[in-house]
Amino acid sequence: MKLLKPALYCTPLPQEISTQLLMRACGSAHLALVDYNLYLSTYILYDKRMTSISLKTAEDIAGMRVAGRLGSEVLDYITPFVKAGTTTGEIDRLCHEYMLNVQGSIPAPLNYCPPGYTPYPKAICTSVNDVICHGIPGDKILKNGDVVNLDITVIKNGYHGDNSRMFLIGEPSILAKRLSEITYECMWLGISMVKPGNYLGDIGHIIQQHAEKSGYSVVREFCGHGIGTVFHEEPQVLHYGRPGTLTKLEAGMIFTIEPMINAGRREIREMGDGWTIKTKDRSLSAQWEHTVLVTETGYEVLTLSAGSPPPPAFITPA
């Protein structure tokens, strides 16, 4: 998502979270607790929008490895529950409780409120069928044949771990299965271009080429992003473009690669809740996401865990 101004979090603290847990999860440098008498248990986090790309320190990278693994482990945990008959709201509740009670992390999306938006009301995003991104969990019951993207971002010790996976419910259609597979390949092809000296345009180009030669389209309005102690920072990582253009990659950069690929046309429509984005032609959409570090010789995927799907066979390990 493109964020051009500082974003504000303003979140009621759940009763089960202690101030000490919150401080450990967020990092005291990024936390301001407000008057309990006036605001009850409300905290405010400022997403300090950076105007330049930050190269992460060794300490930052260590923190991002922890947060990334935890983000992926939430997806491992929830996998058995993502099935026909389960509501997206129940999936959100289970993920939220796992973050708080097992990991000691907190969900970054909860009440995330960039300029022009209303606060996001849930802990995760659940995007079903023709929902491209930012689907809000609720009463929707998953049914056989559905496709759903679960987008998870945790905060641990002030660092963000951001990733998403596709889930196919029951017996998916051939179209749904192929769309998910091609989108997964698009993400990994983009990742394979990450190394010092390459360009952001190289990432976008290879994703666009693979999607379009497969008969699909790439969403333009939303993109990957830099990430660290800030949820969304520079650079913006487009999933389309020309090779050899945009920012040159340097060791120490960390950003997400999260292509949104539509089975039909690329145009979007915004829903009335202020968050949910759907395909304009009501075609299926898919998305996969990893957080990636640029190393001295290539890349390191930070959002891997025991349950992560393996890379496609044609991807050469970094």
Regions found by a protein language model. Give the residues of each.
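Intrinsically disordered, low-complexity polyampholyte segments enriched for Lys and acidic residues
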Residues: 2-5, 16, 35-37, 47-48
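Low-complexity, intrinsically disordered segments with a bias for serine/threonine
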Residues: 22, 30-32, 45
